[in-house]
């Protein structure tokens, strides 16, 4: 199975299944001498961890990460960092009824078409449980970017269903279970989630992720443009069906005179481009949005087929998120951090000696 690695100089390879013994990853390219402990990674893992509120899956995994290699006396050695998280709360019996049935909207059908078999327990490798290791690896990147370059990465929920959320106060994001920056909408979100749980249904969401302090110059035209790699990374997250950079699809309704980010002696006057021009960072905030579909793991009966091609009706059992967009926030932050870390190392490798007289803001 290919496709388990992302990055060139900062490389992350993950392994493991939803109901396997453990999840793990190998992180290559981390510079030596960086102070690193398991506690540095645990904060973001706790933000993503299931079973932390009544709005998410009640699968209760502690998600305690173990550093197996690449760290000595509390600092990175420059060698491969091995990370492991044990699975402790599997209920594989919840999935015995779907052994020979393809859940509509899931990867069951496509995995079996591709590999000729599938791990039906919680989706196996296709489960979003895999993203725990992305968050652990991303925490390493976030720490390096913040401490060495002052780059801050943060994300939030900006829409759930038909409820738009304004980024009014970033401090609110960590104070509620929705990662919501708009305190005025918390009651509406709560009401929607209660209704969904009662109906046994789910809802889609929009997540925004932003990086500030990113220097100008990151990105490798033409095929490894920074925005292309960010889109690739975010699209690789489970349930993501669309990615926008900056204004995204809103540019369709704009004129060139409105969309261009004019420049004065004081700097850029707008950021419709989302901090990336020609595939290279401009020094402005990098802004990306992603749309997540409503999960198909619901108790509303639906039509499907079994392995013999017979039509059957099914209800998905197990413990699932009514809105997967909530826990996607720390995952999006991690993927953006991984891409920026990789591009920063690549930029330094080729262009460390480049000096320009062009203003930077």
Curated annotation (Swiss-Prot):
GO terms for molecular function: chorismate synthase activity; FMN binding. Its EC number is 4.2.3.5. The keyword Lyase applies. FMN binds at residues 125-127, 238-239, 278, 293-297, 319. GO terms for cellular component: cytosol. NADP(+) binds at residues 48, 54. Keywords: Amino-acid biosynthesis, Aromatic amino acid biosynthesis, FAD, Flavoprotein, FMN, Lyase, NADP. Pathway: Metabolic intermediate biosynthesis; chorismate biosynthesis; chorismate from D-erythrose 4-phosphate and phosphoenolpyruvate: step 7/7. GO terms for biological process: amino acid biosynthetic process; aromatic amino acid family biosynthetic process; chorismate biosynthetic process. SUPFAM superfamilies: Chorismate synthase, AroC (SSF103263). Reduced FMN (FMNH(2)). Homotetramer. This is Chorismate synthase. It comes from Salmonella schwarzengrund (strain CVM19633).
């Amino acid at each position: 199975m290919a496709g388990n690695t992302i990055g060139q100089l900062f490389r992350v390879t993950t392994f493991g299944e939803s109901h396997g013994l453990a999840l793990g990853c190998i992180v290559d390219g981390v510079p030596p001498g960086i102070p690193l402990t398991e506690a540095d990674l645990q904060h973001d893992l706790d933000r993503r961890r299931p079973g932390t509120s009544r709005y998410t899956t009640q699968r209760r995994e502690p998600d305690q990460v173990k550093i197996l290699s690449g760290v000595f006396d509390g600092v990175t050695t420059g060698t491969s960092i091995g990370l492991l998280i044990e699975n402790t709360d599997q209920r594989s019996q919840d999935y015995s009824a779907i052994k020979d049935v393809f859940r509509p909207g899931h990867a069951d059908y496509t995995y079996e078409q591709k590999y000729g078999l599938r791990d039906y327990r919680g989706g196996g490798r296709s489960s979003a449980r895999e993203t725990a290791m992305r968050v652990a690896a991303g925490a390493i990147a976030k720490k390096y970017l913040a401490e060495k370059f002052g780059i801050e990465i943060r994300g939030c929920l900006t829409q759930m269903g038909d409820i738009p959320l304004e980024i009014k106060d970033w401090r609110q994001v960590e104070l509620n279970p929705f990662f919501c920056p708009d305190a005025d909408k918390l009651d509406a979100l709560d009401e929607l989630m209660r209704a969904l749980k009662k109906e046994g249904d789910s809802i889609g969401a929009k997540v925004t992720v932003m990086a500030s302090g990113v220097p100008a110059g990151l990105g490798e035209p033409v095929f490894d443009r920074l925005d292309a790699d960010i889109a690739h990374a975010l699209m690789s997250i489970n349930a993501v069906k669309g990615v926008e950079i900056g204004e995204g699809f809103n540019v369709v309704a704009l004129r060139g005179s409105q969309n261009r980010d004019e420049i004065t002696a004081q700097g850029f006057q707008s950021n419709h481009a989302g901090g990336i021009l020609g595939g290279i960072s401009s020094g402005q905030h990098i802004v990306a949005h992603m749309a997540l579909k409503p999960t198909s793991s619901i108790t509303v009966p639906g039509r499907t087929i079994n392995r013999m091609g017979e039509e059957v009706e099914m209800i998905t059992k197990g413990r699932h998120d009514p809105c997967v967009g909530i826990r996607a926030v720390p995952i999006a932050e991690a993927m953006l951090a991984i891409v920026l870390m990789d591009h920063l190392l690549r930029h330094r490798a080729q262009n460390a000696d480049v000096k320009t007289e062009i203003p930077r803001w």
